[in-house]
């Protein structure tokens, strides 16, 4: 989290009715805001490329049925899970594998993959427990500890509808690394670093934190 972000956040909060410096002390003070969003290092590591999670593209599986279409059109959830399952188990679990075990049991027509899919799939493939959260700092802490995360995104940077992405790590300066199952050469998100608050959390519905490998 940068000082510029902290200043913007401070200005935004202090513009709200009854939120003033004189009432809340240093709560909105820039340095305090900056410290608040600093990641607490509890022994986590910061590999340059994050966790070595394979990058699957849903567009490679247009011939595999899923939902009302195919994995290419509707399978961002299973594709995201397949990346994490392959990483955690050490086995190659492809997007078709992530769909074949349950078919459309966790798919709601016109909406997409049910959120309950992730824990059910993790149990099926032996990936351990999954924790759902909406707290950005909890996610950053989990990433710093080497725990992969899936995020549900609403319209914004990553999608014009609804979408699931994988968060594969956090850099030493607090930027987040992403495996987007709908990435492309033009977007090249695999080689980008993202600001957690303004680019990911701003359009996040929820997160699913997986066990550490």
Please place each PLM-identified region on the residue numbering.
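Active-site-adjacent structural segments surrounding the nucleophilic cysteine of cysteine proteases
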Residues: 41-107, 185
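Noncatalytic regulatory segments and standalone regulatory/sensor domains
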Residues: 57, 170-213
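Catalytic nucleophile-His microenvironment captured as a short glycine-rich beta-strand/loop
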Residues: 1, 76, 148-183
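Mid-length scaffold segments of soluble, non-membrane domains
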Residues: 93, 100-134, 144
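Non-catalytic cell-wall polysaccharide-engagement segments
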Residues: 1-44
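Extracytoplasmic/secreted cell-surface and envelope-processing proteins
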Residues: 109-116, 158-163, 186-188
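Loop/turn elements at helix/coil->beta-strand transitions in domains of secreted/extracellular proteins
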Residues: 125-129, 145-149, 172-175, 202-205
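Solvent-exposed, acidic/flexible segments
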Residues: 22-26, 69-78, 91, 95, ...
